[in-house]
């Protein structure tokens, strides 16, 4: 049993095999479901940011659910803004962000931008690398949003292209990337001998044929790699049983 504390998050390494030559050696960090709360201390926030920095990522990817409270979301991004990521920082919305910032998405976008992080809502960016390019896309969240990726995302006529898709929910896209990064599930949050609320039908994602059965870990689905992170916090019940908070270090080889 562990509380959802930002001091408790471990760094889980994942080797992403089969990457093209221009992606090999890249260190990227995926952080999701941070859930900063009013009672999250500055020491906890600083410890989390230091852990992110210690992983030495060139690229930071964020999976949403930063906080239920705009002021605490701003605290998180102010702290994150102290760090520098050579290839940039990109994030998507979670359902809690959509609720907290309803009608004020421009302010969230500005808050993230001031920290050097770009919010992707059904959009993508291309990052040039030596010998190829990395495309990072992000979809709107599924509960309140309208998911439809832009045409640029699907344009794969460039040579030497690797695509990473950020989605808060583990709902499989029709146009599948090389790697998909998701959160939301908190790894089940309660795991008793392999039994989680999701195994009991707690929540369903989208159309059945597109919903991933995975609630945590790295998986291969028809050639697409899918990582569902356990994330760090929780929005209401601040407790985890059998599920350790994590941030995810991606090592491409």
What do these predicted ranges mean?
Residues 31-32, 59-65, 88-95, 120-123, ...:
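Active-site neighborhood of phospho(di)ester-bond hydrolases with catalytic His/Asp-centered motifs
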Residues 15-17, 126-128, 218-220, 249-253:
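Short, well-ordered beta-strand micro-motif
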Residues 170-248:
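Conserved beta-sheet core of the metallophosphoesterase superfamily
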Residues 66-69, 95-99, 125-127, 141-144, ...:
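Solvent-exposed loop/turn segments at secondary-structure junctions
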Residues 25-35, 133-142, 164-168, 225-231:
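Active-site-proximal beta-strand elements of phosphoester/diester hydrolases
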Residues 101, 106-117, 129-171, 240-241:
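Binuclear metal-dependent hydrolase catalytic cores centered on His/Asp/Glu-rich metal-binding motifs
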Residues 22-118:
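Membrane-embedded segments
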Residues 1-22:
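N-terminal membrane-anchoring alpha-helices
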């Amino acid at each position: 049993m562990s509380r959802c504390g930002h001091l408790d998050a471990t760094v889980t390494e994942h080797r992403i095999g089969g990457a093209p030559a221009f992606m090999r050696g890249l260190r990227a960090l995926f952080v999701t479901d941070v859930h900063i709360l009013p009672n999250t201390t500055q020491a906890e926030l600083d410890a989390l940011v230091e852990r992110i920095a210690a992983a030495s990522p060139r690229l930071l990817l964020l999976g949403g659910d930063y906080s239920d409270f705009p002021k605490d979301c701003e605290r998180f991004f102010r702290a994150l803004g102290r760090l520098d990521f050579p290839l940039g920082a990109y994030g998507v919305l979670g359902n809690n962000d959509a609720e907290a910032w309803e009608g004020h998405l421009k302010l969230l976008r500005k808050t993230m931008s001031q920290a050097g992080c770009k919010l992707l809502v059904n959009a993508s960016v291309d990052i040039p690398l030596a010998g190829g390019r990395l495309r990072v896309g992000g979809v709107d969240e599924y509960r309140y949003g309208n998911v439809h990726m832009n045409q640029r995302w699907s344009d794969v006529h460039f040579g030497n292209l690797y695509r990473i898709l950020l989605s808060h929910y583990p709902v499989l896209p029709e146009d599948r990337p090389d790697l998909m990064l998701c959160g939301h599930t908190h790894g089940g949050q309660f795991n008793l001998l392999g039994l989680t609320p999701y195994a009991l039908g707690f929540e369903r994602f989208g159309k059945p044929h597109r919903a991933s059965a995975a609630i945590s870990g790295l998986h291969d689905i028809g050639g697409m790699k899918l990582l569902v992170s356990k994330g760090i916090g929780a929005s209401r019940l601040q407790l985890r049983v059998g599920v350790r908070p994590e941030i995810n270090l991606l090592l491409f080889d």
